[in-house]
Every structure is written in C-alpha cells, then in structure tokens.
Amino acid sequence: MGFWENNKDSITSGLKSAGKYGYQGTKYVAKTGYKASKKHYNNSKARRERKSGKKNSSDEEYESEDEMEHERKPTDIRSLKDPKSFPPPPLKPGQKTYTGQQQQQMPNGQASYAFQGAYQGQPGAGSMEQSQYAQPQYNQYPQQQLQQGVVPQQPPIYGEQVPPYGSNSNATSYQSLSQQNQPQYAIPSQVSLNSASQQSTGFVSQNLQYGTQSSNPAPSPSFQNGLQCHQQPQYVSHGSTNLGQSQFPSGQQQQPTTQFGQQVLPSPAQPHPQPQQQQQGQPLPPPRGQVILPAPGEPLSNGFGQQQQQQQQQQQQQQQPLNQNNALLPQMNVEGVSGMAAVQPVYGQAMSSTTNMQDSNPSYGASPMQGQPPVGGQPPVPVRMQPQPPQPMQQGNIYPIEPSLDSTSSTPHFEVTPFDPDAPAPKPKIDIPTVDVSSLPPPPTHRDRGAVLHQEPAPSGKIQPNTTSSAASLPAKHSRTTTADNERNSGNKENDESTSKSSILGHYDVDVNIMPPPKPFRHGLDSVPSEHTRKNASERAVPILPPRNNVEPPPPPSRGNFERTESVLSTNAANVQEDPISNFLPPPKPFRHTETKQNQNSKASPVEIKDEVLPGHPSEEDRNVEPSLLPQSKPQSQSQSQFRRAHMETQPIQNFQPPPKPFRRSQSSNSSDSSYTIDGPEANHGRGRGRIAKHHDGDEYNPKSENSTENGRLGDAPNSFIRKRAPTPPAPSRSEKLHEGAITSEVDSSKDANKYEKSIPPVTSSIQAQQSTKKAPPPVVKPKPRNFSLKANEYPKELTREATGQDEVLNSITNELSHIKLRKTNVNLEKLGGSKKVKDSSPVPSDLDEKYVSASGSITPPRPPPSRSSPKKVPPVVPKKNDNLKKKPPVVPKKKPLLKSLEPRPIEMERAYSGDISAADDNLNPFERYKRNVVPQEDDRLHKLK
C-alpha cells in the first residue's frame, strides 16, 4: 500500500479543517479591519467636515462623544481659578518688565494702566501685598492721585492682592519694590509726593526698577530724571496737591514738599519720621513735575497695618485734595495718557509711565533710589522732575499703546485671549511715524530725465543750484523749476533751444549750462565760413557738428568767436578725413613696397642696413621725402596727393629696378635645374648676393665659404660669386648662414645693384634651400652634407637596410627628386673636392648610399646621416649616386627583402629617412628595434634573476 493510500483520509480531513478555520480567521480579520478602517475614515471625515462647517450625523456617531464635547465646549471662565491668585510668571532673561497692561478703573472713574511686568522682586515678609501691588503701581495713566483714596483700583493687578488694603496698595506696591532690594523700607518712611508730583513722577524708572531694583536701584534716579521728563508734564497741574502725604504713618499730610527734586533724600537708615519732618520743614509747594524721592529708612516692620490705618485715616483727610485733584485729573489724564501711553511702549525701560502712580507710587517709583542710598549709608541725591507741558509729550509720543481708557468706566477691564499654539510668536510691532509727504523734498531725478533738467537750464544762469545738489536744496530747486516752466511757457524759444543744446552737449547742470550755450552760439555765429566748413564736415561725416549747427539759432555776439573755432574744427575734421585719404596713400606705399621691397627687406636686416643700405638707399631718402609730402597732402586736394603718389612711385622705380627680382628668380630656377652652370653677373647676383649678404659683417665668412665672398661687395660681387660656388655645399653652418644672411646679403648687394637685393637671397638659398625644401626640410638637409664624416660609411650599411625598407614607402618620384638634388649638390661636392668622393666611394656603401639617398630624399649629399657629423664622406658618394641612382632604383626593391630579413632598423635611420624625428619615432615599433637582440637578452636576464 502506498503512503497516500494509507494517509489519504487523515490528510484530506486535516486540509479541510485547516482551510475551514483559516477561512474563518481571515474573514474575521477582514471584517474587523474593514470596520476599523471605516470608522477611522468616518472620524477623519467628520473632523474635516467639522472644520469646513459641515456635519454628518451618521459619521458623528462613530466619533467619541467625549472628544467632541471636549473640542466643542470651552471651559467656563467662571470655573477657572482667578489669575490674581497665581504668582507672576518669570521674566525672560532680557526682560525687565511685563509688557501687558491693564486698565484699572479708578474710583474717580479714571482708568489707569498697570504695568504688571515688574514682579521681579520676591515679596518680602509681610510684603506680599506690597509685591502684589507693585505691579499695579505701574499705572501709567495718571492714577496717581486717585489711588490714594481708592482701594479697589489696584485689585486688577495680577498677583496676590490684599483687597482690604485700600490706597495702601500703592504704598505696599511701592514697598514691594523697595522690599525687593530692601524689604524693610516701609512706605511711611517714604516722602509722600504731592499728587501732581506723584503723577509726574510716575517714574519710568519705577518700571525699570522692577527689573533692576534688586540689582541696580542706583541708576534708576538717572532714568527717573530722563524718563520723568517725558512723564512729568502730564502731571504738572497737580503739583500743588499733596496726595502722598497721607502715606506717612504719622498721618500728617505734609504740605507739598516744596522741593521734590530739592529735598534731600534722608539716608535709608533714618526712620521715616525724619523725612516727614524734613518735608514738613519745607513749606513751599513742590514745583510741577518735580519729585521728591522718599528715603527708604523704615523697615517693613512698620507693617501694612500701620500704613493701612494711617492711609485710611489719611484718605478721609485727603479726600478733599483728591477731589480737587480729581477735577484736574480728567485733563491730566487726557493729556498725560496720550503722552504716557507713548512712553509705555518702550519695553526695556518700562516706559509705561508709572507717573500715574498714586501717592505711594511716586515714592514707589523713587524706591530704587532709596534702595541704593541706604546701602551706601549716604543720603540719596534728590531727583528733580522738571515740569514740561503735557502736550509736547503727546506730540512726541507716537505709540498708540493707550488701551481704550474710559475715564468714566467704573470696572477694571481685563482682556484675555486664549492661547493659540499654532499662532506665530508675537513680534514687537514697529511703529512707523507718519510723515507729511508735502514736507519732504522732491526725490532726485536722473540728470538725463529731460523735463526738470531742461527747465532748470532754461533761465540764463538764474538757477544756480545743481541738479545733483543735496536733497535739502531739492525743494528750492523744484520751486525754481516750476518758475522756469512758467518762463518757458511765456515763450522763450531761445531758452528752449539753449536747454536742448545743453542737453545735447552732455547734460550740463544749471551752472554748467552757462558755458555750453556759447558753444552752440559759436557754432551759429559765422554763418558763411562756418556753413562752408559745416558742409565739408557734413560731407565728411563729422557727426557732432551738424546737429549743433541745426539746433543753433545765431545770436551774433557770442557765436562769433565760437563759430571761428567751429570753422577750425570743421577744417580739422576735413583734415581728419584727409588722414584716411593719406592713409589711402599706402596704395602708393604698396607700390613703394613693390619697388622698395628690396629696401624694406634690407631694413628687415638692420645690421646690413647700417653698412650697406645707407649708400644704396636713395630710395629711402625718397621715402623720407614722401612722408614730408604726405602731411602736406592732407590739407591739399586728393588729386595733388595722387600726383605725388605717382611721382613717388616713379622715384623708387628709378632708384630700384623691380625686374631683376623676377630675373633673379628665373636664374634661381635655372640654376636649380642647371646645377651651378650659371655664369656672369647674373649667377653672381643670384647666388653670390644671397651668400654674400648673410651678415653685413663680411669677416664671418671665410674665402672658402660662400659668404666669405661678402668681402668683395658690390664691384667684387662677380668674382666673389665664382669663389662662392665651390665652397657652398661643404659648410653646414654656411647653409644656415645662407638662410640667415639671405636677407642681409640682399642689403649688401643693394650697394652695387639696388634692384637685386631682395631677389638675391632667395636665389642663393634657392640652390640649396629650395632644393632642400622640395625633398627634405632645409635645416636638416644642409647640416647633413656638411657634417658627413667617415662614420657615415659605417652607418650606411644599416642605413641602406633601413632606407631600403623605407624605399618601398618612397615612390619613384622621391627617388627622382633625390637624384635631382644630388645632381645639384654634386656640382658643389665636386668643386669641394673629388678626393673625398674617392675616399667615400666604396662598392657596397655606394649602393647603400644611393638607396639611402633615394629613401631620404635629401637635397644635400647622399647619406642622410644617422650621425650628421660625416659631411666629407657624403659628397664623394653623391656623384656616384647621381649616376647610379638613375640606374639603381630597380635595385632598391631587391635589397628591400634582404633588409627586411635583416635586423630591424635603428631609429636614426628612420629619422634620416623621414627627416622628422617625431614622425619617425611615432612610426617606429620598439619591439622591431629590439626584438632580436634585446628580447632574448631580457629572457636570459630573467632566468639569471631567478
């Protein structure tokens, strides 16, 4: 039985059960997943619709009601804890005061700003209320007077407030500041400031002091001085009232401390009764805006209870002055609020003018001063608040930070905005002062802008300020330009023209325009000559003059002088145009060049010119005469210049005969064909001059050398030419000298015959140089025949092999060319010496040399040397090559297979054959060079190394 048959039932049942449960499981998972995804989709959809204002009741069912309720129902404010019970939040590291402001309803109906930012100091023992009220003390709005009598004013202040404390809250808040540095100072110790002084003193320093009291109370007085000045004017009217006096525990309302600034601050150690006495001693009412800084001498132990009692008593006493002050306050509030509100925006300084501080507040503002002086033990310096009119402060203060102050509102106003985490961080608003545009000067305009600029120059020098002058002068200019417009509208056409002219002349400013108008006037003055010159200039395409002439009306007086100058300019312009005409004179110059090319070529070799050209160049003198004529021809008519050109052309033709150049060329070509068969002066001119003139110094040339005949210059030329023919081939340096001195030799020959100078150097060099150029580069070929030595015979064996290998590459044409060159060179070589030919000639090398010559195709003697130092051997071989080369070109292919079978060619053979070393190196295969000799040696060397 098979395995399947035995287990078939169990296997099938297992598969069925597995499939069944698997299906159920997958179905369940699919359902749950579908439900979950659907629910999630519905929830998200409901949220999206909720945001868009749509609602789906069916979708909302899936959403958790808790979340919905939580999202929908904001917490009731009444259920929240009173923020007053919370301590103030910590200040940021660079923050001195809180920027938030409150409007506190004064019982008088005046709202006061409370800078609550100043909770820096921790409330001292028993100073909790004081610290609480420290913030409300920054009632920038002139609360000062009201706070004394009103307890509820300060409750809006955040922090722990002790509502029972009435006006004391101000004092306590003041104490809180002092407590921060010196909690022991009680308000009673402070000198109560008159309500006006308190208001005026609503020290900015107080605001600052919240941030700084603990650390730097001392600088506060200075701040008070500077800041108070802004705040003081608001409270000036109240200077007479004495609200702060009630603060003192003595209950005595000290008469206005006549010298708020003058009063000497008692040392902090002194108990408060002393400052009271001092103040009492001072009968004079305090000047408006001046503040007396109370000396913080009393410890807080005085307690709020005493102060409260005292203040409560005082409130009754002070209600009368308060009522009086209240009558003044609405005005003060109106003025002071606007001014102080402007001060408030300053966050760093707590500019929120706490000038509004109630009686305790001014002393409170002074507390920082008090904090420091007690430390030093020295009496604090009194700070005087200078009265200032409140209105100027209003003007200067632009910041509209005033919260809507309702002097009539009876309840504190709280503005609370819910925290929005998504909202961007608030940034301090930059208040841009509004500026009256009419008061600003007109913006500068580009000088090229036509309207204003044309207007300004229109008046004849009346408008002096430059358009580019400072912006301060611009308004005046603007008005002037308007007047200029009126003038132009009045009908000054000439002014319009002058302005347009000035702009044409280059955008002159008003001052500059005085000068430019005369220029156009000068144009227009001399109508007759200027018109002629203008016509000439216009014909001659002088661009600037014609527009000026067209634009200008002719006022005679000023234009007369300038028109003369203009006529001169036109004549100059005509001359300038003649300059290109004179430049056109070069056509005769090219004729001169054709005639005087010999002279110019001689000039090309300055050394020869020194010796030879000077006698032989009347043509140059003629040239010198010509340039003198050229400048003269500029003012003259072109016909005269052309006539002179023709005359000049005739002069160089007379002095120099151009025909010999082609004649010499014909000789050079004939000489190349005839190979030194040239006779007579022509041959002498052809070869000898080129050889003679290598360097104007004839000493360099030996009598044997071609150039040596330069010694016989001019008259000796024919004889020297004969001598030169024989020595020409052997000297390698001579051939180079011939190339170098070819131009110079022309100069030398110019002494005898000026005509032949130019043509001679190419002719002399043409025998060798031209032939060399045909078959091989002349510099390479020339040294080879001259430098041949006995070594050349040694190399030719390899050379012939190489040459034969390359003869295949060389065509029969190259062989023929090499034969031709050999013929020409053979003449020279034979003249040089036939003995060398005998020595050099050898049966085997001669064949090799012939093949080699065909391969190399060199003009110079046969064997293009692997070593170029064997010139002597080559020349004797050359004549044989001449005869043999004609017969032996078929022999070369025979040697080719032999040479191929032989060892590879050396690189030098390649170079000699190709004439270009770089090309030969590129064509060579290094393995071919070394394969027979070097490769087996390297194998042996490797074996040895092993």
Swiss-Prot record:
Polar residues: compositionally biased ranges: 166-244, 351-364, 463-472, 762-773
Name this protein carries in UniProt: Altered inheritance of mitochondria protein 3
Positions of modified residues (Phosphoserine): 57-58, 64, 473
Ranges of biased composition (kind: Pro residues): 376-392, 861-878
Subunit structure: Interacts with RVS167.
Cell compartments where the protein resides: Membrane raft
A GO CC term assigned to this protein in UniProt: membrane raft
Bias (Acidic residues) ranges: 59-68
